[in-house]
Amino acid sequence: MGYMGCWCSNLGRKYSGTVSPQRSVQPEALSYEMVYSWQQSFDTLMSFKSGQKCFAEFLKSEYSDENILFWQACEELKREKNSEKMEEKARIIYEDFISILSPKEVSLDSKVREIVNTNMSRPTQNTFEDAQHQIYQLMARDSYPRFLTSIFYRETLASFGITEMDIGGDEEKEREQRAERARLNVPATAAEGSSKDISMV
């Protein structure tokens, strides 16, 4: 049986409330096609709640899950309409992720940190926009490539019966996988909404 720890375990440290990113988040019917698509780009991975959760588990193993928690908190702030609650959330985000006294401080350059400090004089939904963008790019550039070769991602793929594949997105390997599914008469979306595994022979 494949390793499915990413899906049943919690994020560890949770930000207040349920995080539903502002960007379009895809349906949660877990399938091989969904998990395999996470190789396409970091944007694709982050468009799935399950993708975010598995990536968060990976970051937690590297002691850097504050990055995705900060990003998610900023997304939550963007949706807040009540001005008083918005200011309170902005203050909490600052104390949790920006303050140099916080154990969860994210890594920002001096220019962006100065922008955040200035914005905090009158917090808005976009107070941390520059900081959020910088952390997103950091995760995409630094953590995402390692995630694709991590046990969290490989064993999630293995849970669908895929035990050997080029995690880098090798086109020839992908064509072979598609041809094998066609030979077995397995539709591309067979795993969606179903508990059946896609097995390779």
Swiss-Prot record:
The organs and tissues expressing this protein are described as: Expressed in most or all neurons.
Its keywords, alphabetically, are: Signal transduction inhibitor
Where does the RGS domain start and stop, copy by copy?
Answer: 37-156
MF GO annotations: GTPase activator activity
- Looking at the record's lineage, which domain of life comes first? Eukaryota
Please list where the region (Disordered) is annotated: 168-201
Supply the InterPro entries for this chain: RGS, RGS_sf, RGS_subdom1/3, RGS_subdomain_2
GO:BP terms for this protein? chemosensory behavior; negative regulation of signal transduction; sensory perception of bitter taste
- Where is there biased composition of kind Basic and acidic residues? 170-183
Q: Does the entry feature the keyword Nucleotide-binding, yes or no?
A: no
Q: What does this protein do?
A: Inhibits G protein signaling in nervous system, interacting preferentially with the G(O) subfamily member goa-1. In vitro, protein acts as a GTPase activator of goa-1. Rgs-1 and rgs-2 redundantly adjust signaling when worms are fed to allow rapid induction of egg-laying behavior.
Q: What is this protein called?
A: Regulator of G-protein signaling rgs-1
Which species is the source of this protein? Caenorhabditis elegans
Source species taxonomy: Eukaryota, Metazoa, Ecdysozoa, Nematoda, Chromadorea
